[in-house]
Amino acid sequence: MSVSVFNRCWSKVILETLVRQGVSHVCIAPGSRSTPLTLEAVRLQNAGSVTCYTHFDERGLGFFALGIAKATQSPVAIIVTSGTATANLYPAIIEARQTGVNLFVLTADRPPELWECGANQAILQQNMFGQYPVANVNLPKPKADYSAQWLISLLEQAAFQQKQQGGVVHINVPFSEPLYDATDEAVDSHSWLQPLQRWLIQTKPWMNVEAQQNEVLMHENWDHWRTKRGVVVVGQLPAEQAMGINSWASAMGWVLLTDIQSGVVPTTPYEDIWLANQTVREKLLQADIVIQFGARFISKRINQFLQAFKGEFWLVEQSGKALDPYHHSLTRFNAKAHHWLRAHPPLRQKPWLLEPLALSKFCATFIEQQVGGNLTEASFALRLPTLLPYNGVLFLGNSLLVRLVDALTQLPESYPVYTNRGASGIDGLLATAAGIGIGSNKPVVAVIGDTSTLYDLNSFALFKNVTQPTVIFVINNNGGAIFDMLPVDEQVKDQFYRLPHNGDFSQIAAMFDLKYAHPYTWADLNSVVKQAYSRRKATLIEIKTNPSDGSSLYKRLIEQISHAVIGA
């Protein structure tokens, strides 16, 4: 039996199984040992079953796949060769695990006889990602002793675990040489595949799993709790779940606190600012019940409120993951937000607390005065909605600016917002944004800090794949300005935290064949954004700001509002 032919048969069954589990995008890094998998992925692309993407940097490739999976809400497959190529996927796997994004990670491996004996590019790959995958599938070296039906069943069981929990399935696939001399005809006619002929011409999985009917029932004490003083807190949510939360909370007369990732229009904007007011915060803590939708809040003030609240606490979240870092004694609903709302009709009543609305109005005027008309980090955050395309999506990086956007920006209802807030790292942000562009097939606006951009420069190469207008705003405050918030000596901050680079990104844009602009005023910015939306490709727009302006304004707003005396 030809080893190369059977390697391909083995790979064919793996990839055909994944396609039947919803995979339609395959992200591939170049490598020799992964050739059987790559060639079968190419065959599937030629048949119209998948679209393949390539990238030379496995770390960026992992985040690119993550972005596609976020936008499509379908699993994405990744193929890499053996050795440290596999390890470079770890950051994306961690982020996927934290946020329940489904990826199938296929790592080609040397065969067992080459492990731990000094063989080239052979590392210990079995279970190498520890507990971060929802399932680790350590396949044996391809052998006809194992039936194709066994292989499919093993993979589908792992896929079932993924559907239940959300996250990564790691499939380690050792291959012996030779890898290259198999023909498609020899693979398709191999006797090992004969029991699968009927399955291969269909699109159904091997095992049919009936979908669970998760009907949301009204809580037995809802008629009691809906008469009480409540606070609705909304974190990261899929866009389709955001509709209706605002009107529901308003009808109840309850206070609504929203994260920028929620897609919910706030009734009392600038929560991250006005929650700094101690008087209002203390009154808010007198609520009888908090109902939280989603999780992973950016706002420090919202997190502080959740930590301090000791009353009745309900969490509505569909993933089933533990998402209460403050360990409340709570009632948990594993449900989508809009399904839960339908099962819990509101009781119309007047607002029980008026100070948040008064403070919010005060903040609106005060913030406008403080921000001014120049093009700065804060004015960019405040006026970001004016730069967004209709029917587009927004990706926010992890930097000072995401906090300014969360504090100052009011987005249209259900405008899709994507972030990497599972582990909140600065790695892979450009790659994720590129993947979201591919997965959504919509215009994309990405807002990323300069240090994050430097960290992921290779991923600019991925934007060659986009087919919709894509604007990458790089907010260049000359290093990690977010560290200005730390109570550390200024000299130590520069040397060990901020790390100023004193550069710009014009030559980087040229290297990756990206359109580039560096506007100095709002008029210039509006003009270059309009031009960018006329092109179905990526444009890098660099906005240079004074290093401490954004953090200084942010701290000033918090300080001023914390002592404000506002009459309801």
Swiss-Prot record:
Q: Does the keyword Repeat apply?
A: no
Q: Which InterPro entries match?
A: MenaQ_synth_MenD, MenD_middle, THDP-binding, Thiamin_PyroP_enz_TPP-bd_dom, TPP_enzyme_TPP-bd
Q: Name one GO molecular function term.
A: magnesium ion binding
**Main EC class the enzyme belongs to:** transferase
Protein name, as recorded: 2-succinyl-5-enolpyruvyl-6-hydroxy-3-cyclohexene-1-carboxylate synthase
Recorded hits in NCBIfam families, A to Z, give: menD
Q: What HAMAP family does the record tag this protein with?
A: MenD
| SUPFAM superfamilies reported for this sequence | Thiamin diphosphate-binding fold (THDP-binding)
Per the record, the similarity remark reads:
Belongs to the TPP enzyme family. MenD subfamily.
Record field: catalytic activity = isochorismate + 2-oxoglutarate + H(+) = 5-enolpyruvoyl-6-hydroxy-2-succinyl-cyclohex-3-ene-1-carboxylate + CO2
Q: How does it assemble?
A: Homodimer.
